[in-house]
Amino acid sequence: MPGMVLFGRRWAIASDDLVFPGFFELVVRVLWWIGILTLYLMHRGKLDCAGGALLSSYLIVLMILLAVVICTVSAIMCVSMRGTICNPGPRKSMSKLLYIRLALFFPEMVWASLGAAWVADGVQCDRTVVNGIIATVVVSWIIIAATVVSIIIVFDPLGGKMAPYSSAGPSHLDSHDSSQLLNGLKTAATSVWETRIKLLCCCIGKDDHTRVAFSSTAELFSTYFSDTDLVPSDIAAGLALLHQQQDNIRNNQEPAQVVCHAPGSSQEADLDAELENCHHYMQFAAAAYGWPLYIYRNPLTGLCRIGGDCCRSRTTDYDLVGGDQLNCHFGSILHTTGLQYRDFIHVSFHDKVYELPFLVALDHRKESVVVAVRGTMSLQDVLTDLSAESEVLDVECEVQDRLAHKGISQAARYVYQRLINDGILSQAFSIAPEYRLVIVGHSLGGGAAALLATMLRAAYPQVRCYAFSPPRGLWSKALQEYSQSFIVSLVLGKDVIPRLSVTNLEDLKRRILRVVAHCNKPKYKILLHGLWYELFGGNPNNLPTELDGGDQEVLTQPLLGEQSLLTRWSPAYSFSSDSPLDSSPKYPPLYPPGRIIHLQEEGASGRFGCCSAAHYSAKWSHEAEFSKILIGPKMLTDHMPDILMRALDSVVSDRAACVSCPAQGVSSVDVA
């Protein structure tokens, strides 16, 4: 950090990123040099054949060339190990070394070509020597090809626009010019991100919704990354440091922060009842994912169980529309929910941007009409997730501030129109008019379910919603408070999605910058220690030491790079640890739905939960407990529906077996 400037443009790699690539190349080159030297010493007496003098010269020059490359790579590696992320001064000679290293590729290419030509001419020498030359040529071209691929990966399309301003500084541009430059860079960045997203989603149909989602997602990414000059390894190092810092804070505060109390019997009974409901309705939320999740959960027997359903002809007992392998999907739904064919009213696997698959079924056990909305499982769903602007939710309620996540709001509106306009709910309640309406979903489906329940509440006042691992950035604070009477959310452990919002991502970015600015260890040590800590654990107190107090001014400065300099010129920018997060009108603070049940793992079950059965406690939690993203190896796995289902199985069975335990689930630990 910042990205290096070479050949007049910025690259998405920093001068301290070359330790590990350099070490890998150094090992390959040294082994290669030893092999060539051994080959030459053992067979130099057998090179008196036709063309042998050329091969002898080839091997000698190759060894000299390899020795020069080894020395250059060693120097690059040593220089890259100097300094810290925020102190690139000791690495100022890196650009010259890289120019030398790149220049050495030309004689390597020439020599590899000559070796290939000589071998192709049919040199009549010892076969071992010829095979050694062939191996040398192959290795040379593999390294050259790998270098070309690496250059493509670290190429920054905006590098040519940003590099000229790295030496100009703010003193060379007035506020008007700097504002124009910033707007120009942001426009270019949005265009680049939109091109990337279109390439990634090249197989998605291009309708109006998709084009809007492309633009919305591109603007989100360009806005988020516009005020820093972070390279990917900086983010990885920051996340590693932040994880250790969070664990250290939790360990130090735990004795003072644990508050044990005996809640009222009504509160505990309510928690037990809602946990049982969550345990029951999670089956429907999982069923909405269809056969992929079912096979994933049952890798050995799943395919055999639903194989017959895949080949079975459809019946007329239910509507089954959209998507492929519909009978496979429906077979997995039957096995997951335990319902019969006649219990399903409508099953849709139609999947487009802002249009989510869903199912409607009659649940006779709970006497409810269940609407289950599928979560993220396709690129179309990802684009729906990333359409993070806010729009006013069109609902009939007394709440004034009705802002909601645009993508999820439109997805919920689509399901609402299908349920009402196509008469799906009317059909369901004509069969079971005494049943109540329950809407469920996981992840994106959980957010859509919460919005859908709010839209339907005017027509169905008794509606209930169970949102499993819903995104935090769903709707306004007023709607969050309004929804607590009919929506329950369930969150497992450090799951990142219920903590994910644009505001929280901005907070995470600032915390990463802050912890990186404090650290006085080189990046390669941070990454090595972080990898060890993630895999095997350790003592989080062994954090890299911090900068002296006199260097605290680093925290009030944007980290290096032209875009950071541009934001520094803006009077609206503040990097102070005490400054509030900026709230853009397009991305205001948004909150999770309803009341929240938090499942937390008790004891240790291995770093990834695979060493022994985990046990969980459950408690009601305030939404503020999910106002920061927590880093850890389970922040992604805790979001998986199969992991959540196992956690629910565990906590429900444990609470049922411990009805006489008054302290069940009453501990609360707040982690800053």
Curated annotation (Swiss-Prot):
Q: What is its main location?
A: membrane
**CC cofactor:** Ca(2+)
What is the name attached to this protein's record?
Diacylglycerol lipase-beta
Tell me how activity varies with pH.
Optimum pH is 7.0.
Q: Which reaction does it catalyse?
A: a 1,2-diacyl-sn-glycerol + H2O = a 2-acylglycerol + a fatty acid + H(+); 1-octadecanoyl-2-(5Z,8Z,11Z,14Z-eicosatetraenoyl)-sn-glycerol + H2O = 2-(5Z,8Z,11Z,14Z-eicosatetraenoyl)-glycerol + octadecanoate + H(+); 1,2-di-(9Z-octadecenoyl)-sn-glycerol + H2O = 2-(9Z-octadecenoyl)-glycerol + (9Z)-octadecenoate + H(+); 1-(9Z-octadecenoyl)-2-(5Z,8Z,11Z,14Z-eicosatetraenoyl)-sn-glycerol + H2O = 2-(5Z,8Z,11Z,14Z-eicosatetraenoyl)-glycerol + (9Z)-octadecenoate + H(+)
Superkingdom, taxonomy of origin: Eukaryota
Summary of activators and inhibitors of this protein: Inhibited by the 1,2,3-triazole urea covalent inhibitors KT109 and KT172. Inhibited by p-hydroxy-mercuri-benzoate and HgCl(2), but not by PMSF. Also inhibited by RHC80267, a drug that blocks 2-AG formation.
Task: Give the species.
Answer: Homo sapiens
Family recorded in the similarity comment: Belongs to the AB hydrolase superfamily. Lipase family.
GN (gene name): DAGLB
The record places the following residue ranges in the Extracellular compartment, namely 39-58, 124-132
Residues on the Cytoplasmic side?
A: 1-17, 80-102, 154-672
A Gene Ontology biological process annotation? arachidonate metabolic process
Q: Which GO terms describe its cellular component?
A: lysosomal membrane; nucleoplasm; plasma membrane
